[in-house]
Amino acid sequence: MAYVDGFLLPVPKKKLPAYLRMARKAGRIWREHGALEYRECVGDDLDVKMVLPFPRLAKAKRGEAVVFSWVLYKSRADRDRVVAKVMKDPRLAKMPKEMPFDMKRMAYGGFKVQVTA
């Protein structure tokens, strides 16, 4: 069963270019170690009225973009294997120590894929 790691985070718009540079590097590392997909999406159509909008869920402040990201794996076991390799990759240690966003406001979780259409 396919598995997804999902992320939702607010990123200051002035730091968005730095975040995306970091994400491109991270995406290459994850893909090289076996992730099937690595996606970083910046909010565009987020002014919704009928449901809880992502900016409110992410507690985005004025001047922040909302980023929705996911990484797709073959299975939970494959995800565990890939992430273990990624964490040992020396390129990850070269990433900036200071993140271009507030880590305390990032949401994360692992999900079993139930429907693929």
Predicted segments, located by residue:
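Residues that cap or initiate secondary-structure elements
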Residues: 13-15, 77, 114
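Generic detector of contiguous secondary-structure segments
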Residues: 18-31, 66-71
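Short amphipathic alpha-helices in soluble, non-transmembrane regions
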Residues: 20-26, 82-90
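Long, hydrophobic N-terminal alpha-helical segment
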Residues: 1-25
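Glycine-rich beta-strand-turn "strand-cap" elements at beta-sheet edges
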Residues: 31, 35-62, 88-117
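Short, well-ordered beta-strand segments in beta-rich or mixed alpha/beta enzyme
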Residues: 4-11, 50-86
